[in-house]
């Protein structure tokens, strides 16, 4: 199986400016992400950025970097530009790994690529079972439900499926655990151009979940439970300190 990993990295961040270049035990965060992705067996790992500072750092540690427009409205549009600039063929599998996940397990990058290769869907992603009560009703923990074949029926910030009887009795962790979506995607490269030419859907605007556009237009997304539960990404200075503590051991 052949696949390419693309890691979008933007300098601007509301809660942590310059996040991709934040030092973690002597290396910038984006280098940690790049090195984890490079262990997944991909043919190529590309960092996509619109910032010359990130470009210089990536070149400095020997990484593959593609400069993109600063005017994209979504990360998916940025992927489409990289695919065109780098000559990635339409049937190639592309895995999108977030640039703020220095602890991402290489195994799940490979898993989502393999799942797409084995499925009839043009897109695949992963989930983990919810075992923390706080996540059940947390709108920032996106839930997903699938059909019998593992294809997504819906993604929501609400608690789906709603366990009427269990919740009525005050229970929060149910006998059939809810699934929390994690933000790693695999696509057929050609599908990304199809996707960005669709108009945003009503549902994605309501939920603020871009992946709902795929279901709205009748395409499939394969979902599997991740082999390893990834650690949380870095969104705040507090998250950064936690990651530094883990990687310093």
UniProtKB/Swiss-Prot annotation:
GO BP terms, alphabetized: CMP-keto-3-deoxy-D-manno-octulosonic acid biosynthetic process; lipopolysaccharide biosynthetic process
Purpose: Activates KDO (a required 8-carbon sugar) for incorporation into bacterial lipopolysaccharide in Gram-negative bacteria.
Cross-referenced Pfam families: CTP_transf_3
Record keywords: Cytoplasm, Lipopolysaccharide biosynthesis, Nucleotidyltransferase, Transferase
GO molecular function: 3-deoxy-manno-octulosonate cytidylyltransferase activity
Main location group: cytoplasm
GO annotation, cellular component aspect: cytosol
Protein name stated in the entry: 3-deoxy-manno-octulosonate cytidylyltransferase
Gene (UniProt): kdsB
EC number: 2.7.7.38
